[in-house]
Amino acid sequence: MLFTVSCSKMSSIVDRDDSSIFDGLVEEDDKDKAKRVSRNKSEKKRRDQFNVLIKELGSMLPGNARKMDKSTVLQKSIDFLRKHKEITAQSDASEIRQDWKPTFLSNEEFTQLMLEALDGFFLAIMTDGSIIYVSESVTSLLEHLPSDLVDQSIFNFIPEGEHSEVYKILSTHLLESDSLTPEYLKSKNQLEFCCHMLRGTIDPKEPSTYEYVKFIGNFKSLNSVSSSAHNGFEGTIQRTHRPSYEDRVCFVATVRLATPQFIKEMCTVEEPNEEFTSRHSLEWKFLFLDHRAPPIIGYLPFEVLGTSGYDYYHVDDLENLAKCHEHLMQYGKGKSCYYRFLTKGQQWIWLQTHYYITYHQWNSRPEFIVCTHTVVSYAEVRAERRRELGIEESLPETAADKSQDSGSDNRINTVSLKEALERFDHSPTPSASSRSSRKSSHTAVSDPSSTPTKIPTDTSTPPRQHLPAHEKMVQRRSSFSSQSINSQSVGSSLTQPVMSQATNLPIPQGMSQFQFSAQLGAMQHLKDQLEQRTRMIEANIHRQQEELRKIQEQLQMVHGQGLQMFLQQSNPGLNFGSVQLSSGNSSNIQQLAPINMQGQVVPTNQIQSGMNTGHIGTTQHMIQQQTLQSTSTQSQQNVLSGHSQQTSLPSQTQSTLTAPLYNTMVISQPAAGSMVQIPSSMPQNSTQSAAVTTFTQDRQIRFSQGQQLVTKLVTAPVACGAVMVPSTMLMGQVVTAYPTFATQQQQSQTLSVTQQQQQQSSQEQQLTSVQQPSQAQLTQPPQQFLQTSRLLHGNPSTQLILSAAFPLQQSTFPQSHHQQHQSQQQQQLSRHRTDSLPDPSKVQPQ
C-alpha cells in the first residue's frame, strides 16, 4: 500500500518536471527568435544607411556618368581627399601668416591695401628693361594706366641721365653668379635702388614731371615659380612672350614714392557703372543720400546731410562744375562733366552726374534737384579729355602675334609712315596722344640726392619731342576727320597727293612688302573717309539748295501774283478780279479797268450801261485784269467827261495794293439797315495796283489809298422777309444781284449796288450811242439771269441762290419807289434813289 502510494507520487513528480522543461525550452526559443529578428532589423537598417551614404558620395564625385560600385566610389573619394590635402599643404606654405593679416581679407585684397598704404605699386621688368607687369595702383600714384607701361621699356620713363645707371644695376647684378641656383634666388638677389619716373598727364603738351621713387625687389626665375605662387601674375604675360621668358629672370619690385601723397586718386573701379542717388536743394546742399552711396564714397547719409556738395569737389573741377550747374538752372536737366569727389578715406573718385529739377505739383515752383551719380574710371576720363583736346587714344603697339624682337620692325614702319605723312603735310604737328608709344625721353636730371621729388622738364631739352610717327598719323587723322570739306574738288585735291606720294615711296631695307602695304592700306582708308565725308557734304548742299529754290518759288507766288478769285465750274456767277483804284478824285478820267467775263474783255462803262439796260450775262471763268484797249479807252473818256461825279480808275500806280473781295452776301429785309459795309484785306501785288473803294449812299465813288476796302450797299426793302447773311465763311466770289422792281412778290431777294450817278436822258442816249462799238464784245441774249450757287457750311444739299432779272419794263422803277415807305430810314434812301433814277421811257434795249 505504501509502495503504491510512493509510486504514484514519483510518477506525478516526473510529469511535472517534464512539463516545466518543455515550457522552458519554448520560452528560450521565443527569446532567440526575438533577438534574431531585432538583429536582422538593425543590420538591414545599417546596410540601408550605408548604401545611402555611398550613393551620396558617388554623386559628389566627378565623372559619375556610369554607375559605380561601392569600392570604386570609396577609391575615388580617397584620391580626391589625398589631392585636396596636397593642395591645402601647398597653399598653407604660400599663405600669409595669420598673425599680421586679417582673416576676412584675401591675399589679393591685403596686397592691394598694403600697396596703397606704402604708396607703391608692383613692377616686373626683364633684365633688358622690358616691362611685363604693372599693378593697377600705378594710376593713383603716377597717373599712368597699366597699358601705358606694359610691353614698354623702363628707360622710356626714366630721365636720360639715369639710363646708364639703371641698366648697369639690372644687368651686372646677375653676372655675379653664372648659375641661378635656388639658394642664390632666395638669399643673395635682394636689390634696392632709387631713380626718377615720369608722371603721366592727360594733355601730352604739358611739361613733363618726374617723381623720385625707390625700387625694392629681387630676381625671380619664371620657370622656378610654382603655379600657385604666381598669384595671377602668369596671366598677365602675353602668350607669345612666355616661351622666351621660361628660362629667363625678371626683376619683381615694389616701387614706392619717396614722398608719400596725402590724397590720392581712386582710379580702380572693380564694378563698373556703380551709381547712387542723392537729392540737393537749389543751393546744392545734400537733402538725401540713398543706401548705395556708403560703399562707394564712404559717407553715411547723416554725415553729408546739410553740407554743400562743393565741399567734396576737387578745386580743379569747380569751374567746370559751376558751368554745368548754370546749365541745369537754365534748362532744368542735364549731365555734368567728369569730376573728382573726395571720399571718406581721403581719396579722389571720378564721378559723372545726371540731374534734373523737380517742381511742386500745385504751384510749379522748383523744389529740389535729383542727382544720379555714376562712377567712372580714369581711363574713360582721360580718353574723354583727350578727345576734347582733339587727340585720339592709341592702342598698345604690340599685338598677340608679335614677339619681343618685332620692336625694330615697328620702328621702321613708323619712320616710313612718318615720311609719307610729312610729304602729305609739311606743317609740324604737336605731340601725339598716348604716352604708351613713347620710346625715348630726353631730360637732364641732376643727382637724385640734390633734386626735389618732382622735377619739371628742362625747356631747352623737351623730353617728348621725338615721337613715333604713328602717333602723328593718329593726330592728323583726327584733325582731318574734324574738318568740313565743302566740295569734291577739295577732297580730291587733299587725298590724291597722299596716294601718289605714298605709292612713290621707296620700301626701306629690312621692311617687308606686307608691312608697306599695310601703310598704304591706312592711307587708302584715310582717303576713303575723306571722299565719303565730301559726298555727304555735297548731298547736304544740294538738298539745301533745292529747299531754298522751293521757298523762293513760294514767295514769288505769294508776292508776285495779284488778286485772283476762282469760280467753281458747277456754280457760274460774277467775279471781280483785281480792281485798281487811284487815290483821290480827279477831273480827268485816265483809264478804266476792264472786267473779263468768260474770257471776254468788258470795260467798266459797258458794265454800267449794262446795269442800266439789264444786259449782264452769266460768267463761268475767273475775272482777269488785262490791258485796256485804246478804242474802248477813248470812248469811255468821251462819254464820262461830262459827268458831275467823276470816276478815276488808273491801270497802274506806284506803291499800290490789290484788294481781294471776300464775299459778303446781303439779302435785304425790312427791319435791317440800309447800309452794309464789307471789309476786305489787301495783300501786296508786285505788278498790279489797287486802292480803297468807298461806295456811299449819295452814289459817289471815291477812291483813296488804305488797307481796307469798305463797300456800302444800299438794300431795298421788299414785301417778304429777307435775311442778311454774311458769307465770309463761304470764301467765294462777290455775287451782286442788281435790283429788279417787279410787281410779283416772288422776286423778294434784291441787292442794289449804286456804282455811279445816273445821268440825264440826253447823256444816257449819248452813252448808249458811244458804247455801241465796245458793246460788240458782249454776245449775250437780251434776257439774262445772274445766278450763283453757294454751299452753306459745306452742305451740298443746302444752297443759297440769288437770282435777279433785268426786264425792260417801265413799271419797275415806280414799283420800287412805292415800296420804300415802310420806315423813316428807308424813306430817305428811297428819296436818294428816286433822284438818281433816269426816266424809264428813255431807256432803250440793247
UniProtKB/Swiss-Prot annotation:
Free-text activity regulation comment from the record: There is conflicting data about the effect of NAD cofactors on activity. PubMed:11441146 suggests that the redox state of the cell can modulate the transcriptional activity of the CLOCK-BMAL1 heterodimer; NADH and NADPH enhance the DNA-binding activity of the heterodimer. PubMed:23229515 reports that NADH and NADPH have no significant effect on DNA-binding activity of the CLOCK-BMAL1 heterodimer.
Could you tell me which residues carry Phosphothreonine? T451, T461
Known outcome of mutating P840L: 3-fold increase in PER1 reporter activity by CLOCK-BMAL1. Some reduction of CRY1 inhibition of CLOCK-BMAL1 transcriptional activity
Gene source species: Homo sapiens
Q: Which GO terms describe its cellular component?
A: chromatin; chromatoid body; chromosome; CLOCK-BMAL transcription complex; cytosol; intracellular membrane-bounded organelle; nucleoplasm; nucleus
- Any extra remark in the record? CLOCK-BMAL1 double mutations within the PAS domains result in synergistic desensitization to high levels of CRY on repression of CLOCK-BMAL1 transcriptional activity of PER1 and disrupt circadian rhythmicity.
Q: Where is this cross-link: Glycyl lysine isopeptide (Lys-Gly) (interchain with G-Cter in SUMO1)?
A: K67, K842
Query: Which stretches make up the PAS domain?
Result: 107-177, 262-332
Q: Which post-translational modifications are recorded for this protein?
A: Ubiquitinated, leading to its proteasomal degradation.
Q: Which gene encodes it?
A: CLOCK
Ranges for region Disordered: 392-411, 420-495, 624-654, 764-783, 811-846
Q: According to its UniProt record, which reaction does this protein catalyse?
A: L-lysyl-[protein] + acetyl-CoA = N(6)-acetyl-L-lysyl-[protein] + CoA + H(+)
This one is known as Circadian locomoter output cycles protein kaput
Q: Where is this region: Interaction with NR3C1?
A: 371-845
The segments labelled Implicated in the circadian rhythmicity in the record are 514-564
